[in-house]
UniProtKB/Swiss-Prot annotation:
Pathway: Amino-acid biosynthesis; L-leucine biosynthesis; L-leucine from 3-methyl-2-oxobutanoate: step 3/4. The record marks Y139, K185 as: Important for catalysis. It catalyses: (2R,3S)-3-isopropylmalate + NAD(+) = 4-methyl-2-oxopentanoate + CO2 + NADH. Catalyzes the oxidation of 3-carboxy-2-hydroxy-4-methylpentanoate (3-isopropylmalate) to 3-carboxy-4-methyl-2-oxopentanoate. The product decarboxylates to 4-methyl-2 oxopentanoate. GO terms for molecular function: 3-isopropylmalate dehydrogenase activity; magnesium ion binding; NAD binding. Binds 1 Mg(2+) or Mn(2+) ion per subunit. It comes from Staphylococcus haemolyticus (strain JCSC1435). Belongs to the isocitrate and isopropylmalate dehydrogenases family. LeuB type 1 subfamily. This is 3-isopropylmalate dehydrogenase.
Length: 346
């Protein structure tokens, strides 16, 4: 079988962290004996410059026909039109592909615990996943309205939308420590009341998974005070956006966190959670670990190469443990240095 992979370098540091990651992919494919076809397309700000829009039709069509999509980063200060921003391309891509589930792991290993702004004894052993609903809620609700005197956003969830994200979370939890935390604001919001009711109904299909409900404000506190207590967290779009960014501070750098976006069928999108960092673009300073770990997620989730994924992850964590890191992690290694070190494993 030949896997069809679409690369979206995007903006800022995106092209440099993705290009090195694709070189690693080539070496990994030879070691693990699989074939793939790779095509690269403009996306985000780069596509605005070349095509006038952040998500050109040819890019979207290629993504629809892919087995997996690897994205570098989008955005930058030079694209100022509020009606034609790079980030709108990402929202449109998620919607077009039905990428309703965003998966963000947060892991603190022996080599990374000292980077955390939180006391090392509190974060050591942290290993949880946030499952965020990605295509509904406040960000997509209608009607919406703004004028000089008032503004309106609409928060809407259907039972079906809650059921499908819950199934993803329960299945992940059943493969891990069998512990699921559902986060809502059930004491105030009608959507959260439906959310909690639906989670409880689906829990009967997974009797081995222990379900705990937390209000979002309590969860935001416990993520910092007791991060090792969590395994899988499931929540709606806005809450997930905030909590996953909060969680990304636990390992000590945005550059350490990968993510994946899933649909029920079709391609999955893999990307680091950090932004495009235009201030350090093209200077060989970017931390590529989040992009590399996103490739590991791709190998595991889209291609079922568990051994290849684990080997790559362990190689990254060993580099960090050995102090072979970029400037943001108090190291002196360049972006290309990191890739060259990892290539030695293949």
């Amino acid at each position: 079988m030949t896997y069809n992979i679409v690369a979206l370098p995007g903006d800022g540091i995106g092209p440099e962290i993705l290009s090195g990651t694709l070189e690693l992919l080539e070496l990994i494919s030879k070691k693990y004996k699989f074939d793939y076809q790779l095509t690269s397309y403009d996306f985000g700000g780069a596509a605005i410059d070349s095509h006038g829009v952040p998500l050109p039709d040819d890019t979207l069509n290629a993504c629809k026909n892919a087995d997996a999509i690897l994205l570098g980063a989008v955005g930058g200060p030079q694209w100022t039109d509020p009606n034609n921003r790079p980030e709108q391309g990402l929202l449109a891509l998620r919607k077009s592909l039905g990428l309703f589930a965003n998966i963000r792991p947060t892991k603190v290993t022996e080599g990374t615990s000292h980077f955390s702004p939180i006391k090392e004894s509190r974060v050591k052993g942290t290993d949880f996943i946030i499952v965020r609903e990605l295509t509904s809620g406040l960000y997509f609700g209608e009607p919406r309205h703004i004028d000089n005197q008032s503004a309106l956003d609409s928060l809407t969830y259907t039972k079906k939308e809650i059921e499908r994200i819950a199934m993803v979370a329960f299945e992940l939890a059943s493969q891990r420590k069998k512990k699921l935390t559902s986060v809502d604001k059930e004491n105030v919001l009608a959507t959260s009341k439906l959310w909690r009711k639906t989670i409880n109904e689906i829990s009967h299909e997974f009797p081995d998974v222990k379900v705990n409900h937390l209000l979002v404000d309590a969860c935001s506190m416990q993520l910092i005070s007791q991060p090792t207590n969590f395994d899988v967290i499931v929540t709606e779009n806005l809450f997930g956006d905030i909590l996953s960014d909060e969680a990304s501070t636990i390992p000590g750098s945005l550059g350490l966190s990968p993510s994946a976006s899933f649909s029920l069928e079709g391609p999955r999108l893999y990307e680091p959670i950090h932004g495009s960092a235009p201030d350090i673009a093209n200077q060989n300073l970017a931390n590529p670990f989040g992009m590399i770990l996103s490739l590991a997620m791709c190998l595991r989730e889209s291609f079922n190469f568990e051994d290849a994924a684990s080997e790559l992850e362990q190689a990254v964590y060993q580099l960090i443990k050995d102090g072979k890191t970029t400037k943001d992690l108090n190291g002196h290694y360049t972006t290309s240095d990191i890739f060259n070190e990892l290539k030695k494993n293949y």
